[in-house]
Amino acid sequence: MAKILFVNPNKWGRGITHIWIASHSGILKRNNHTVELFDATFYSDWSLNEVKFQTKNKMYKQTNYDDYLKFNSNNVLDDLQKKIFEFSPDFIFWSAISSHIHGEGEYVNIQNGYDLLKDLDKKNSILLTGGLQATSASEIILRKMEKINYLIGGESELVLLEILNSFDKKKSLNASVDLESIDGISFIKENKFVQNKKQKIINDLDKISPYDYDIFDNQSLLRPYNGSVVKAVDFEMSRGCIYSCNYCVETIIQKYYDFNESSPKTGAIKNFKSYLRNKSSKKIFDELLYLNKEKNIELIRCQDTNFLTNDRNILLELSNLIDKSDLTIKIYIETRPEGINEKSIDLLKKLKVDGVGMGIELADETFRENALNRFADQEK
């Protein structure tokens, strides 16, 4: 089967389990491909100490988080080169889209990963990657980062699987490998930009679950939370947001999949039920059960774009499954203020939600609606 090296170019110097790594690794391993990870997070010559900086700024409560960490003093480029020589991957991949798009370095992965790889000897490895920039400005990226062989626009789990399956099939037949007919990819050929037909959106998220969190080392599972150090993972129960705020990177993905129209009264995209997709309650619960009981995960950091717009029936089913279980977890979510009411608070409690993050735009109503495409009930 095909061999692929994931490179995590995270520069934050703290535990993050990037969802794209877990989602892509899971489906590739279940299809018998070999996946390994080179994680640059804890290299002293690469990463910053984000926790120390934010603690000093009073953004985080004081903890002894640093006592749990061991930074690698080796040269990150030397170690990555060694990994490539030892593993000899068919593909190298370092950026992709998931719900984890709004911060924590996801949007700069493509640049940081390329900076790590561009001057190394990749042997015969094929360089391909995805993410927001690959989706919104693929030709610019390919012209600027000219050592990249292929880009994947939009959600890339199934496209990457098709690429590896196709490669493996051709390799087993001793045939020449031609990946240029696969939907969802773009590339430069004879100095001309080629963008293939877009792949379909992943309608059934259960197809790409469960995600592979075993690929991360223990340091990546640790993070500060409310004055304590806990074992945590970044997680998604859904993908997509029903709203189309002009300042949000979510609109890049919406436009890629042709969700171009929105309501002038609410800012919600038309046909949003086809864009906002949820895992089944059973699949979510099974993942949570494994993480809590097998990996001792305490905190589930949900990166769902707007948690309270998720399918309410699925959330109710999940809350019942959690309520009847002996799960010892806390869940942190992000949502919009207008979704908060007595019923939703009761539901969040039953789901073991411990923290809620919300954003509020401090601007007058006219500017917010006309310039930001953000609508909210002033009274609420």
Task: Describe each model-derived feature in a short phrase.
Residues 2, 122-126, 148, 327-329, ...:
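A short helix->loop->beta-strand "cap" motif at the edges of active sites that frequently abuts
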Residues 2-13, 97-98:
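Nucleotide-activated donor-dependent transferases that construct or modify glycoconjugates
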Residues 4, 127, 182-183, 300, ...:
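Hydrophobic/aromatic residues located in beta-strands of well-ordered beta-sheets
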Residues 6, 94, 129, 153, ...:
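Conserved beta-strand positions
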Residues 8, 39, 131, 335, ...:
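Short beta-strand/turn micro-motifs composed of small residues
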Residues 20, 24-28, 34-46, 68-201:
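Glycine-rich beta-alpha loop elements in corrinoid/cobalamin-binding modules
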Residues 45-73:
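Charged, often glycine-rich, active-site loop that binds/positions anionic groups
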Residues 209-380:
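Radical SAM [4Fe-4S] cluster-binding motif and immediate context
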